[in-house]
Amino acid sequence: MKSAAIASNPSLNAAQKQPWKLAFFFCFLVLLCDGADIGILAFTLSSLKEEFGLTNVQAGALGSWSLFGMAIGGVFGGWACDRFGRVRIIVIATAMFSILSGFSGFVQSYEQFVALRFVACLGLGSLYIATNTLMSEMVPTKHRTTVLAALMTGFTLGSLVITSISAWIIPVYGWRTLYLLTFIPILLSISMYFLIPEPQSWKEARALKLSGLKNSLEKPENPYKAIFDNPKHRLMFILWSMSSGLLLFGYFGVSNWLPSYLETELGIKFKEMALYMAGTYLTMMFAK
């Protein structure tokens, strides 16, 4: 009976044939690297201030430029996923932040670091939305909620990993070595390019668009009109946007400055500070 039901449901059958487990493996790893790369600034901020003689305003601007780049990357990544493909954007975004963050280890000025960091964060922001979109389309419905929840732990695990690595690398080898390690995710980008296909749903939608056919479920020309025309949808969109913005403001604001504050203002040794941050990220990971 079960096999007959699957055979009668082409979309379910197609979803099960897609290598979603392999896709999850790669998406989890690239999100781990994403979380680690976002967190790397917090643990190198004190070293950057010392080497380049930065003021608190300049140091804070590094975090602001990073978040600005991620915001633009998130918006652009959503559009690019629909136009160019989910896997393709993940590959490009991973390669972008990996290469540019890696070259940040060679910078000789504050301005060079800001420029590389901003462009790298375009990739970091795009990656978050692209991995979620890909897995939403590839994973069978009965596993989707669990898989997406597990996927999100990769981001927090990345923060935990960079905390542990920082405690070992920075006191001995310096902050530049930590950035050089971010060249490693380029290997994931190359592997995904050859091993993970685009989801079947995107291929079909793309084929329809290229052939000029109209889908009865096609989105309206202006998708934002569907949100703002309906008062209930409009209110929900505004409230969720505000709550999400405030949440990210608090999270990244604390994450960027807390390590530096613990080390410089409270006089906590770097390794002890890293241990404290590791406990914070570990708690977050289990909460997810």
Please tell me what each predicted stretch does.
Residues L22-N56, V254-P259:
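Extracytoplasmic
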Residues L41-A42, P231-K288:
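Extracytoplasmic gate region of multi-pass secondary transporters
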